[in-house]
Amino acid sequence: MRSALGILLFAATLSAQTQPPVRDQRTFRTGIELTSLTATVTDKAGHLITGLPRDAFQVFEDGERQTVTQFTNERVPIGLGVLLDISDSMHGKRIEDARAAVDRFLFTLLDESDEFFLIAFNHKPRVLTQWGRVHDEVTRALVALRPSGGTSIYDAIIESMPMVEHRSRQRAALVVVSDGADTASNATLRDVRSALMRSDAFVYAVAIDSPEPQPINTRVNPQALREITNESGGRTEVVQSSADLDAATARIAEELNSQYVLGYTSSHASDGQFHSIRVRVAGAEYRVRARNGYVATR
């Protein structure tokens, strides 16, 4: 999550919450170990809380209070990867609904300062578009999709990691859309969790869990997806039908547009060890979602 893992070093303007977010590339400085966090704050009912000041936040690493040195409650541009299931079970209306939801999500609900890439996966992942936001290119890629084969969610996430690392935007996120359990990956759930500990990306998943009878080993596994998303600071949306994809991705977009970005200089060295992170809002009954830790790469 630091140094070679794309730890963000904010421009000085980000420390002033009245300033607009910087919209150019991330910057790096040798020898500075600034750890960056993206945090989502909600009330008990799940409503997003925006506009909190820096001093409302407390950050703990391995139980030790850290000093928040960089902060913004303004929207920060994001580099986002969409990982779309095109296994055989996504045929017909499901792929049609997925195409429409992804298009609306990327070009209507996100900000023009954001960039993204697309990966489709069945028995293996395939990069459809590189970083950018060219509407015609995305449309052609989505229209050309023909569902077939198995499901390799874990391989798709692993495949996306180098692309996330080489983004030009400050925040990083992945959105996985799938209707099935992983049946074809070489990577394991443990491999994915390990990779995400070394990345600053947070992960969202939209799981289509149809009430229709399906073979047990192919039905979507929300618990496995939650293990991935919750640890990274994201979350899993479970929907009953592909018709609900629009609403689910709209909720994710609203969250991406309402997050806080915090930075602190860790009191720990880059020792190759896992360090836990906890973020809380002092004096308020709010819930804060952020990654639960990272591996400090040497």
Language model features: what each stretch is:
Residues 5-17:
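Hydrophobic h-region of N-terminal signal peptides that target proteins for export
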Residues 16-298:
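Scaffold/interface architecture of coatomer-like assemblies
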